[in-house]
A protein has these predicted regions:
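Conserved beta-strand->loop/alpha-helix structural units within folded catalytic cores of enzymes
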Residues: 78-92, 141-159, 222
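Alpha-amylase-like alpha-glycosidases and glucanotransferases acting on alpha-linked glucans and related
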Residues: 118-146, 150-153, 163-391, 395, ...
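Residues immediately flanking
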Residues: 159, 263, 318, 442, ...
């Protein structure tokens, strides 16, 4: 019997051996495994593809008033931008700008001295692989990328596959463009708008292989200069097959590259681009302003299958988009949209100086174009203005960094408020260790109040015991009890509240000395 006992103990020890358990986990029994009917590709991307904060500026507007800013001027702003909590610095095209049909202030016909639109790429200085000499040299740009990295910032470049009439491609490869009956190259049109300063590529040219290879070489060139993040201009106007091929080629050698699709188009097209490999996508967020609109839109984005392939990047404004809400809502509208973008989405961005300073002047009645837009002229921004939003932006980004719940697009739930001017939602980690409630007054003019109802049990909070709600924007702490609690938000003070819940307040029963 003693021998049998020793043998049994040895078998037990062997069965419980940690090393054996590790081997069994690594090499599981596959005798019952079946093959999926379709072969699926799994793509692994950097964390920044999921969680990022973007800041956009025009380098030429970073100099002294009346002078063209340079990469060196941008470099001097890096501590400030990084200090606000951003980790991506997005620059519009930095290439030479064409002179033919150059645009002037407010999209008028250009005059001598106008800097033109950065999206009219190409001149006698060069094309997509060249740097506008007014900004500096290629070495200056490389230095900017290096110094930005030291501040925790990735420099994102704009990829705009289009040319000015002066681009070297128009002379060297006229076959890459569409032509009019008179033989001239066809400029871009989006009726009733005409863009005489821009020639789009003809992706259906008989020389498409050479064209595609050259466009790929542009992306690779800038990767070689240290760029790992790209914002792609109007990808929905190019063939799907082109993007599937180009992204595949780029990712094969550089899987760390992140591509943001700037495609304001039909949802099916936006979703198709995401499935083809774009890391992030612009959204309709800018035009969803009421609580019901926001609820409906983000319920769509947060549910499978869309959430499995579409990563939203939320922008309350861009150089092209100054919404009516921002035009008429005053400073409180900018604050509300900032909080919404930064807490509804794991990735968001702002067109920086204009947003910080609450720039709300439209070019025309009913237009979303900025008056005196930076797209066509230099702007001198008073970055030190006392009414700027820098302090709030810094605080919101700090809250995002400290709370894992805000670093993913999963875990979003909306909650009733009994007031359709209040939007209430929680973001939580899968284990509910981090739960944040955000309540936003979407009415930028009037104080709103209501009762917010929460499913406390889902968050590990006993409904019969008080718990602490720490409001992170003001620092205030409230003692809440039960699932329904009162909130009141004055938009002129702060149009939003972000609560972090602390576990139930302890009572005498919770201490050892209670007998």
């Amino acid at each position: 019997h003693a021998g049998s006992l020793r043998k049994a103990r040895g078998a037990t020890a062997a069965a419980l051996d940690a090393g054996l358990g590790e081997l069994m986990g690594r090499y599981a029994d596959r005798s019952g495994a079946v093959r999926h009917p379709r072969e699926l590709a799994v793509e692994v991307e950097p964390v920044k593809a999921r969680f990022s904060a973007w800041y956009e500026l025009f380098p030429r507007s970073t100099g002294e008033p009346g002078t063209n800013g340079t990469f060196s001027d941008v470099e001097s702003l890096l501590p400030e931008i990084s200090g606000m909590g951003f980790d991506v610095l997005y620059l519009p095209p930095i290439h030479p700008i064409g002179r033919t049909q150059r645009k002037g202030a407010n999209n008028r016909k250009g005059t001598p001295g106008d800097p033109g639109s950065p999206w009219a790429i190409g001149s006698e200085q060069g094309g997509h692989k060249s740097v506008n000499q007014d900004l500096g040299t290629l070495d200056d740009f490389r230095r900017l990328v290096r110094v930005a990295a030291e501040h925790g910032l990735d420099v994102a470049l704009d990829i705009a596959f289009q040319c000015s009439p002066d681009h070297p491609y128009t002379r060297e490869h006229p076959e890459w463009f569409r032509h009019r009956p008179d033989g001239s190259i066809q400029y871009a049109e989006n009726p009733p708008k005409k863009y005489e300063d821009i020639f789009p590529f003809n992706f259906e040219t008989e020389q498409w292989r050479e064209l595609w290879a050259e466009l790929l070489s542009i992306v690779v060139f800038w990767i070689e200069q240290g760029v790992r993040v790209f914002r792609v201009d109007n990808p929905h106007t190019k063939p799907f097959a082109f993007w599937e091929w180009l992204i595949g080629e780029v990712k094969r050698e550089h899987p760390e590259v992140i591509l943001l699709a700037e495609a304001f188009t039909r949802p099916k097209v936006m979703f198709r681009l995401a499935k083809l490999g774009f890391s992030q996508s612009y959204t309709y967020f800018a035009w969803r302003n009421t609580a019901p609109e926001l609820y409906q839109y983000f319920m769509e984005l947060a549910q499978p299958p869309i959430r499995e392939f579409f990563r939203p990047n939320l922008w309350p404004n861009t150089p092209d988009i100054l919404t009516e809400y921002l035009q008429t809502g005053g400073r409180s509208a900018f604050m509300a949209r900032l909080v919404l973008a930064a807490t509804l989405g794991a990735s968001y961005g702002i067109y920086g100086p204009a947003f910080e300073l609450c720039e709300s002047r439209a070019r025309d009645q009913g237009s979303e174009e900025y008056l005196d837009s930076e797209k066509y002229q230099l702007r001198a921004w008073d970055r030190g203005h006392p009414d700027n939003l820098r302090e709030l932006i810094t605080l919101v980004n700090e809250i995002r960094r400290e709370n894992p719940a805000l670093q993913t697009d999963r875990g979003l739930r909306f909650h009733p408020t009994e007031n359709d001017r209040l939007l209430a939602y929680t973001k939580s980690t899968s284990d509910h260790a981090d739960v944040l409630l955000t309540v936003v007054n979407v009415d930028p003019h009037h104080t709103q109040n209501g009762m917010v109802t929460l499913p406390l049990g889902d968050f590990g909070i006993e409904s019969g015991r008080p718990y602490q709600a720490h409001e992170l924007l003001s620092g205030a702490r409230y003692l809440w009890n039960g699932p329904r609690n009162y909130v009141e938000i004055n938009p002129h003070a702060m149009p939003a509240q972000i609560f972090r819940f602390r576990r139930p307040v302890r009572r005498e029963h919770d201490f050892e000395y209670f007998l």
